């Protein structure tokens, strides 16, 4: 089995489904690069991710991003056959902090404007999580903020940081 495959299976992954806002994706990419977490971009983006666009944006960390592109969710699922997909949504009821994260989890986030498709949430409701907010008039957290909260909790729970300090 190729080493890259083993690494993808044995670690947390992050997937963004059809991200629309370049700075959000850039912030998530930096977060993933800093933690050596693979980033999966699923579907079309509202912006270009080619070398020229990345250089123009000054993303000096981009070579460190473990980036994978997928045309759709089925392709993502096929690329990570051993992963447990966990979906983050403002529509979910279960708190992310009540979830027991595993090394094989792939944290899936939807578009900034609409979130994940309704049919995806319905089909995976038992693995849908939300990040609570105290103010009911605030629609949602910024995508990059939400990814940071969930990813660091997953890394904490799976002992990644503890292993680094030993």
Report the location of each language-model feature.
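Post-transcriptional modification and biogenesis factors for structured RNAs
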Residues: 2-166
